[in-house]
Amino acid sequence: MVTIRLSRGGSKKRPFYHLNVADSRRARDGRYIERLGFFNPVARGQEERLRIDLDRVNHWVSQGAQLSDRAAQLVKDASKNA
């Protein structure tokens, strides 16, 4: 099954997440099919906190991809702000 989920990047105590489309059997930070955006939970000042390509998310969902719980919340936030 294909899922849309977060993969962790960044350094210790400074997380940074990419929103990826990946096979559910792959490791969290492993190989992915497509990168759809990012989420920076510790953004400060003028730094961008969230960027998601909603057209591509809708495309993958129409193809049968499942959103993880946190990814679904972030997509909802992004669509509200867009």
Swiss-Prot record:
Keywords: Ribonucleoprotein, Ribosomal protein. It comes from the Bacteria. GO terms for biological process: translation. GO terms for molecular function: structural constituent of ribosome. Signal peptide: none annotated. Coiled coil: none annotated. InterPro entries: Ribosomal_bS16, Ribosomal_bS16_dom_sf. It holds the Pfam family Ribosomal_S16. GO terms for cellular component: cytoplasm; small ribosomal subunit. Transmembrane segments: none annotated. HAMAP family: Ribosomal_bS16. Belongs to the bacterial ribosomal protein bS16 family. This is Small ribosomal subunit protein bS16. The gene is rpsP.
